[in-house]
Each structure stands twice: as C-alpha cells, then as structure tokens.
Amino acid sequence: LLGVWALSWLSVPALVKGPLERIASEQLGRTVTVGSLDFKPWSLELTLRDLSVAGANGAPAQLTIGRVYVDAELQSLLRLAPVVDAFTVENPALRLTHLGQGRYDVDDVIAKLTAPKDEAQTPPSTEPARLALYNLLLQGGRVDFTDNAVGKTHSVQDLLLSVPFISTLSDKKEVRVEPRLAFTLEGSRFDSSAQSTPFAQTRHADAHIRWDDLDLAPYLGYLPASLPIRLKAATLDVDVKLAFEQTPRLAVKLSGQVQTRDVKMTDREGQDLLAFDRLTVDMADVRPLEQVVNLTQVELLKPVLHAQRDAAG
C-alpha cells in the first residue's frame, strides 16, 4: 500500500498537469497554465498553484489564482459524486474590460462555453447535480473592471467569500467556516458577517444581505449588447436572509424581499416597451439546491406595456 501511495504521489502531478491544461484551454478557447500541482493520495488532497488564464490577443492574464486547495473524500468514489471536505481559492485576480456598446474582452470565452452541444448527446438532466461541497472559502480576491468607453477603472479588493456548504447529498461533515461576504469597493468597505452563534454548535447560521435605494442607472450600460431589451432605469432594494442548516437535514434557504422601483425598458431600437412603478417579490422559503420556490407575494404596481402587431401577425 505504501508503494502505491508513493507511486501516486510521484506520478499523478506529472500525468494530470498536462491534460488539465489542455482540456481547460480547449473549453475556454484561451491558454490555461498551472505552475505546479501536488497530490497526496493518502488524504486525497489536491493543490494547484499559480493558475493562469491568458488574456485576449496578447493582453495581460484574464485570471490568475495563487492557490487552489481541494480536500476530497473517499466517498466521492463510493457515491460516484464529488464529496469535498474543503475547497479553498486564494488570491484570485480577475481582469475585465468593457470595450463599449455592451461588448467585453471575455465575449469569446462566454460564446465558447455557451455554444450549442452535439444534438446527438443525451439531453441534460433536470435533476439537481449530485455533489457535497463543504467549507468553501475564497480569500484575497481582486477584480479590476476597466471601462474603455469612459476611460475609468473600478476595483474590488480584499474579496472574501465563505460558504459552509453546497450539497444535494445527505452527507454531514464538520463545518468550520461561517457564511460571510466582505470586500472593498472604490475605497468603501462592505462586510456581511454571520448573524448567529457558531455553526459548529448549532448547525445553523444566517447571513443577512441588505441594500437600500441602489440606483442601477450607472451600471446599465454594461449589460450585454445581445440582450433583446434595454433596461434604461431601475432602483433596487434587497433585504434577504441566507440560511445554512445542517439539522434535521442539509438545506440552503433564502427568505426576505427583493424590490425594483421606477423601472423603464425599451427594445433594441429604443422604443418604449415596459415600465412600472414597483415590482415586489416576498420570498417565504426558496431552496435553490432543491429547486423549491415558495413566495408569499408578488406585486406589480402600475405596469405600462407598449406592444404592436406587425403585418405578419
């Protein structure tokens, strides 16, 4: 057994690194490189360092990641589904550029990923993917968004995101992280921390996200040009609780209210299409991993729809 472990420890990095870079490059249409790969067969721990996705047309790297750590479980083999005890991404840096008129420097990657698949392939299943991911952590993240149309760069720094679990299986593992989102945007700090006692004691944790009077107008120009409608004005209010529960069973639940106000939409030619004073959605129990949506109320106030029937009907 020790010999098998030693052979795996020595051979897996060399056997996996090349195919991983090749397959990832083919899927994205960009050159993907991995600085080093380390695998510990006795604990099923995999570490990637210095991962990079090339930029378009010789531009600087689109994405770099300092370290990716995966602590897999033997149950992954027994259950034929990924079961991961810890997943960590350290120091990811993403560079995005708005070229103008709704075009971005990652349009080629998006087109590659969303291209129609072979029709002969089996249709995708409507069932949730089978997986169990625990202790997800992204830290030291950075996003630089350059708008060539106006000559400005917006930066998100010190991005931290921790999620206790994302699971559609019944496995229960030790949870060591609390739900949290924190970042610095243009010098302003945002930090959403857990609103409960430690998860390890109660098997329950809540994260509360709230934004009031968020004017979306400055960001509407960044919507993709391929959209059939144009959003011209909108104000967003969010008051949502995200709950992670491990007893009596695994669950990720959303509740609260999302509201949009003073919304105006046009078609591609700029003709009025839809406007309304307010759309309010009250969520009682939304469980995305279980495809369950329970709403207490959906209210649309003063909608105005502009429609025309052409000669073709």
Located regions from the model:
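Secondary-structure transition motifs
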Residues: 30, 50-166, 227-233, 249-250, ...
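Right-handed parallel beta-helix
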Residues: 62, 129, 190-210
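Transmembrane beta-barrel wall of Gram-negative outer-membrane proteins
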Residues: 232-245, 251, 261
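Short beta-strand segments that buttress and anchor functional surface loops
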Residues: 50-53, 177-185, 194
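Short structured motifs
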Residues: 32-35, 124, 176-178, 191-193, ...
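Short extracytoplasmic
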Residues: 26-50
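N-terminal type II signal-anchor transmembrane helix
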Residues: 1-28, 95, 312
